[in-house]
Design a protein with these regions (language model features):
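Outer-membrane beta-barrel channels and translocator barrels
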Residues: 9, 70-74, 109-113
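C-terminal outer-membrane beta-barrel translocator/porin domains of Gram-negative envelope proteins
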Residues: 1-71, 79-83, 87-89
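Membrane-embedded beta-strand positions in outer-membrane beta-barrel channels/transporters
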Residues: 1-3, 62-64, 101-105, 136-138
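Outer-membrane beta-barrel translocator/channel fold
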Residues: 7-24, 115, 121-134
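Strand-loop-strand
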Residues: 89, 95-104, 108-110
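Outer-membrane beta-barrel "beta-signal"
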Residues: 104-115, 132-143
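Membrane-spanning beta-strand positions in outer-membrane beta-barrel proteins
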Residues: 1, 76, 114-116
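Residues that define the transmembrane beta-barrel architecture of outer-membrane proteins
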Residues: 27, 57-61, 96-102, 131-135
């Protein structure tokens, strides 16, 4: 299976609210990173300590590739690769926040109730200080 998705949003004012901004990461986009982790960041102060937090962007694209092999009637083993990026402005296809992950998964095909268990790790991660492996559990169809 191959899935490709692209989005862009624009605002009538100078600022786009946080709830309308775009992020990638998690079981429905890039499975090798945590939910909403891939996005442009801003520096936030909290309790006299500062850190960078994901602020979101206005353009995103994501590509998911997956190949699965049946083991028994209701169980498949999958190998997958996810990649994508989030741009800060509308129609901004900058690759500064590009991420690519690979992983393995199990697919349990129950009638009307498919279950996905995935284990993935980033190959290219814009936040290189994070060395993580992510396990995701989801119910529903692939991307």
């Amino acid at each position: 299976q191959i899935g490709l998705r692209g989005e862009t949003v624009d605002a009538f004012s100078d600022d786009l609210p946080l709830y309308d901004r775009l992020f990638l990461g998690g079981s429905k986009s890039i499975r090798g990173v945590d939910f909403r982790e891939i996005a442009p960041r801003i520096y936030a102060h909290e309790n006299k300590k500062g850190r960078y937090v994901a602020w979101g962007g206005q353009t995103s694209w994501c590509m998911n590739m997956e190949y699965s092999v049946p083991v028994v009637k209701m169980l498949r083993v999958a190998v997958f690769s996810d990649l994508g990026s989030v741009g800060e402005d509308d129609f901004d296809f900058d690759t500064a926040w590009f991420c690519w992950s690979v992983g393995l998964g199990l697919r349990l095909d129950l009638e009307q109730f498919p279950i996905r268990l995935d284990f993935a790790t980033p190959v290219v991660d814009p936040d290189e200080s994070v060395d993580e492996k992510v396990f995701t559990f989801s119910v529903g169809y692939d991307f």
